[in-house]
Amino acid sequence: LTIKRLYIHLFLACFIIGNIAVIAQNDSINSKKINIDYTNKGFQFSTPDKNYSFHIESRLQFRFATPNDQSPVTFNDFYLESKTSFKINRARLKIGGNAYKPWLKYYFEYDIAQGNLLDFRIMIEKWDFFKVKVGQWKTYYSRERVISSGKQQMVDRSIINRPFTLDRQQGIEFYGRVFPKTLADFTYHISVLTGAGRSATTNDDNHLMYVGRLQWNMFGRELEMTGSDIKYHDKPTGILAFAAATNRSNYTRFSSAGGGNLLGYVTNIPGQYRVNQALIETAFKYRGFSWQNENHIKKITDYENNTNRTLTGYYVQAGYFFSNILDFVPKPLEIAGLYANYKPDTDINEAYEQEFGLAFNWFFKEHRNKLTAEVSHFSYQNIDSFTQKEWRFRIQWEISF
């Protein structure tokens, strides 16, 4: 693992040096004319003709949590010894830009703490209505997962994310926006992926993952993938999205670590599980108010044991800058709340999981420098109608530079 990290570090160092050298040594460009700026993507080097650009950004996330940091997954998690933690939760290095043409773009994201290459992709974005992406990235399926953990409204994602996310996959995606600024303004994403999780260059059988997402920009304005209305939208901006995915593999769930299995699934035989899932999603921002909601359904067919299981879940999340109506409230302060409900098996009505969350965000410099304090309450009930509850408190400082 140490050697692997060393190779990755060397690769990134060579990549950074090489990109700057290419920009500086291009025959048609004098190195003295290279533009150096500090943007919302970190430091950026670019040529006057905009055909070459290179930006680099570092991101750190410090977190204090008690009695535990992670959301409980099973009833046994409620009985674990309390472990108050203070840690660097995330440390990322982001590199991106364009080469040869402004519309030929690239992006890399490296997890410094874990030594993992999270994202690597090339994008052809010459036309707004049709774009192509190849490589590895967070699958465009659910809003909560696509939004960067550094641009979320709460400290982290809800309990809904774990069972329903498609996370990072490798493959190809076709996407674009059609009929912009009209009542028929739509954004679409169609993906063909390996379906085996992060870093998996091949699938476990001959079945690929297929994902589709159709988003209606209902007011003729596209809503960015960020939490909180820090830009203070003067005009109402909202979306209604539908997404679906199908995959056959030896996994029933995915995470940043790759493929894995939900509780109750223990074997990993190639092609054992067929997973079909879908969601309906809404989001809205207007004058300091923000809203987002997802409703999920997922069906897992186990071909080895001849069983079927259906999972459902949803969350609602909203926030507001109360300084817009109350003079004594500081402008950088936002208050947000979340409720999530998850049913691991729709055939077992007694079993459910609930999460309540309340967050206070203080924005020093939008999402690039913010402090969040959050209190959460979990209430889980099992098949025997036995209930277990727990409170959690977290403080997090998010900074990018």
How would you label these PLM feature ranges?
Residues 72-80, 127-215, 222-233, 252-265, ...:
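Surface-exposed coil loops of outer-membrane beta-barrel proteins
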Residues 41-43, 54, 89-93, 118-120, ...:
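Hydrophobic, lipid-facing positions within transmembrane beta-strands of outer-membrane proteins
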Residues 1-28:
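Bacterial Sec-dependent N-terminal signal peptides
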Residues 27-31, 35, 234-401:
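Outer-membrane beta-barrel pore domains
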Residues 99-118, 134, 188-196, 292-299, ...:
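Transmembrane beta-strand segments that form the barrel wall of outer-membrane beta-barrel proteins
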Residues 45-54, 100-104, 129, 141, ...:
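Short loop/turn motifs that connect adjacent beta-strands in outer-membrane beta-barrel proteins
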Residues 24-128, 172-179, 186-188, 264, ...:
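Beta-barrel outer-membrane channel/assembly domains of diderm bacteria
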Residues 64-70, 103, 114-118, 140-144, ...:
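Gram-negative outer-membrane beta-barrel proteins
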